[in-house]
């Protein structure tokens, strides 16, 4: 008994260690903010031939010149005196100062590139910018998403190219009145055209693969849930479908320019729909009791509605409402991770062996939440954030447990069908044998009757 407990908690420690190493590896090697590349300083990025060969693609995080509360053209920046400060992308999600962080308004970002004299084609990938912008190279307007002056939003992941050999000034004038994030939230990627295109292609292929796998899993789950009358399999199909919708957004933003509403509301809804469905399904598998299950399901459903309404009202939110939602998200995610871990532990103590994979996945998801708090400056180059990986681990563990039951049940069903065929075959053979015996008995009775008749006739003679 003691040996079993030691093995169980040794396995738990190993899961926590491996998941922590996994998240630390993501932070170090798959993080736009931890790339060991030269960054801009005071609005200027100077790169040599050797630096471009060493790092053909980099993410422009630091050293942006920023003009708050103004939509400016390059000529206006050069000819007039405007208030300016330097900032790093990701340190805030709004146009204003940290003392008054409102996401609504406008601002202008600028950076000057000093590139090698050799004329090579360079590429600049512009991720989703909230929510409309004009992009200038030197004095020329080369890209417009939405209408910044009129506040009409349009969002898409875009790429522009230009030739080096001379200083190039990049100016991005942004306005936002429709989303709870404002401005350039995610750092743009800059480098040689081949390197930037390769990074985009790998990211697109990864997202497309994730969408395909989750969609196929959803279809298979719906098929087996209908065939075998299993509600848990149907719920897992809904989880896969929600994860497919969530992972399809990078693909959507690469292929099409879309408005903020309703697409980002749907994305926010899918995030918390996955969490709520995981809670519901794990309650059904681990069976913590009626009251804990009812409370957790109700809280998850209420937060899902809250997140949906928050997304619907994204263009009319006060600063207090934004801060309250951020604090609520933190508390909800922490409580969800802790609750899923506790009910998995209790299920294992009750002797439910099929809950063991879910227990280890919940431990990995808890580690994901902890590292998400300890390492907040993280944005993946490829794939999802820490908490998305945690949700994936739990969904995969639940899927493994369910599919194991489905396969076992399907195998038993096939065995039962084969046994039924054997019984039907034996019954038909018995029926045929009984018919033959009955016919033989009837024939014997006829012969006996004829013999008796002949004997009676002989006696009379």
What are these regions (language model features)?
Residues 217-245:
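Juxtamembrane interface at the cytosolic side of transmembrane helices
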């Amino acid at each position: 008994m003691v040996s079993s407990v030691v093995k169980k908690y040794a396995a738990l420690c190993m899961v926590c260690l491996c998941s922590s190493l996994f998240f630390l590896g993501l932070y170090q090697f798959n993080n736009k903010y931890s790339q060991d590349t030269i960054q801009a300083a005071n609005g200027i990025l100077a790169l040599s031939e050797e630096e471009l060969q060493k790092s053909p693609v980099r993410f422009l995080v630091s050293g942006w010149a920023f003009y708050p509360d103004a939509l400016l053209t390059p000529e206006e920046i050069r000819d007039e005196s405007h208030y300016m400060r330097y900032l790093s992308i990701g340190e805030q999600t709004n146009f204003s100062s940290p003392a008054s962080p409102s996401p609504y308004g406008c601002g202008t970002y600028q950076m000057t590139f000093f590139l090698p004299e050799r004329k090579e084609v360079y590429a600049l990938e512009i991720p989703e910018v909230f929510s409309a912008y004009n992009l200038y190279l030197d004095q020329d307007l080369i890209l417009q998403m939405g209408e910044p002056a009129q506040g009409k939003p349009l969002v898409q992941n875009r790429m522009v190219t230009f030739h080096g050999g001379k200083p190039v000034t990049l100016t991005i004038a942004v306005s936002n009145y429709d989303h709870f994030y404002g401005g350039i939230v995610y750092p743009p990627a800059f480098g040689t055209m081949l390197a930037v295109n390769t990074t985009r292609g790998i990211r697109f292929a990864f997202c497309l693969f994730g969408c395909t796998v989750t969609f196929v899993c959803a279809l298979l789950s719906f098929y087996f849930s209908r065939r075998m009358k299993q509600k848990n399999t149907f719920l897992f199909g809904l989880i896969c479908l929600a994860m497919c919708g969530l992972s399809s957004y990078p693909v959507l933003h690469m292929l099409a320019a879309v408005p903020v509403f309703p697409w980002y509301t749907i994305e926010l809804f899918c995030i918390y729909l996955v969490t709520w469905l995981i809670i519901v399904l794990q309650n059904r598998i681990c069976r913590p009791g009626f009251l804990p299950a009812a409370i957790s399901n109700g809280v998850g459903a209420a937060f899902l509605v809250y997140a949906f309404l928050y997304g619907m009202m994204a263009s009319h939110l006060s600063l207090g409402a934004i801060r309250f939602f951020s604090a609520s998200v933190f508390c909800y995610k922490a409580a969800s991770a802790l609750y899923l871990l506790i009910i998995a532990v209790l299920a294992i103590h009750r002797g439910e062996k099929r809950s063991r994979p879910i227990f280890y996945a919940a431990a990995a998801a808890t580690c994901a939440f902890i590292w998400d708090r300890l390492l907040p400056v993280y944005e993946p180059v490829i794939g999802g954030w820490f908490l998305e990986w945690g949700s994936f681990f739990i969904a995969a563990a639940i899927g493994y447990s369910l599919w194991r039951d489905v396969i076992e049940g399907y195998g038993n069903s096939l065995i039962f069908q084969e046994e039924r065929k054997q019984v039907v075959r034996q019954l038909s053979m018995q029926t045929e044998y009984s018919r033959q015996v009955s016919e033989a008995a009837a024939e014997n009775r006829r012969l006996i009757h004829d013999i008796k008749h002949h004997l009676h006739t002989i006696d009379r003679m």
